[in-house]
Amino acid sequence: YWGEPFPIVYDENDLPVAVPESMLPVLLPEVDDYSPKTFADDDADSAPEPPLSRATEWTTVELDLGDGPKKYRRETNTMPNWAGSCWYYLRYLDPADDRRFVDPAVERYWMDRGGEQGGGVDLYIGGVEQAVLHLLYARFWHKVLFDLGHVSTPEPFHRLYNQGYILADAFTDPVGRYVPAAEVVDGRYQGQPVTRHLGKMGKSLKNGVSPDDIYQAYGADTLRLYEMAMGPLDDDRPWQPDDIVGVFRFLQRLWRNVVDEETGQTRVAGTGLAPSEPLYRQLHQTIDAVDALYRQLRYNVAIARLTELNNAVTRHVRDRGAAPREVVEPLVLMVAPLAPHLAAELWERLGHQDPLDDLAFPTADPEALATAAVVLPVTVDGRRRGEITVGPDADEEEVRRAALALGPVARLVGEGRVARVVHVPGRIVNVVTRA
């Protein structure tokens, strides 16, 4: 019916009367056809009718509203779902209460932010269209409930975050109608040329992509990770299936750092193998950064930092034959919010039975952060040749000298062959040579 019924009836004089509380809730009838009646093409005087108007046994009702039984006509319009959806967050707090929509003590426990201005739900994530639809009405209803003393906070939501759209190619035929994107082959649909557009993925543009194919090819964790890695969460981002391979490889490398694929055995060393000092510092820099990035919803940057740490673990495995448990376990815990299925499997392989959901996020070692040097990979014309360790305050000239003094770099290039040294602070140093 596109919404909840108004608890209103009309008397014989067509005057509205509220249904008393003892007769609530008003239950909607079961009907065979929910479609509304629209204007008749051949009758200019016709009027549209809601589907409830055809439920005559429900519409005409005899009620005793305090002055004896009388016949009334029920309101056949409905509230367009706002009445139910605008306060759902309050009902979620106390869904089993059959006397109140929420217990006041329960509402205060969850919604009161300890004196912080506004209070309300900690975080609301929704599209920008919600601002003029659901959020507008939810805020109105909440303020009414606050004025009536039923809720403890003047605002329903403490923080609002608008996520961007996922965009995909959409196609229109010569007359401008959208055609199924999946059925376009070589720029044509059923033999006709089409025009390509980039638009919001969805039914209206017929350019939706089923996640089932991604699940089958790469698994659910890869899809989750790819969506978070596409770019800032609040930006519109184009769907690029070829990029899925990159995050899939990250998860594969993480798996291989923990599990020997030939034997199926865990390849993580016990407490006897300590991480190198640079790897230990990088671990705690990553913990500190990813903790903050998760709180800021900057998942794409967090994935980049986790990838860098995992690459460092890969090099450690290559050089020393095993991954240090002291690094791998925090890495798995940090990956868990993004790739929960793989993380849970790895956690069990590491010998743990406790669910990851019950564990605290890793804590960074303040000393490692305070004295942290910066480890920079060094490439020559884009090819990795080693890494250097510099102080966190090292200037460009110091980084340049250290990079050019690195053994493999010094053997490959002389000072006269260096065209320029590109330093991306905290990330990489690339030595570009003259042709």
What is each residue range found by the language model?
Residues 264-266:
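C-terminal, low-complexity/hydrophilic appendages and adjacent surface loops
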Residues 215, 268-270, 339, 393-394:
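A broad, low-specificity signal for short, low-complexity segments enriched in glycine/proline
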Residues 1-262, 279-314, 326-335, 431:
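Structured secondary-structure scaffolds
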Residues 30-81, 86, 95, 201, ...:
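Basic, alpha-helical terminal appendages of large translation-related enzymes
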Residues 150, 269-273:
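Membrane-interfacial helix termini and the short, flexible loops that connect transmembrane helices
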Residues 174, 178, 212, 268, ...:
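Short amphipathic alpha-helical leader/targeting segments
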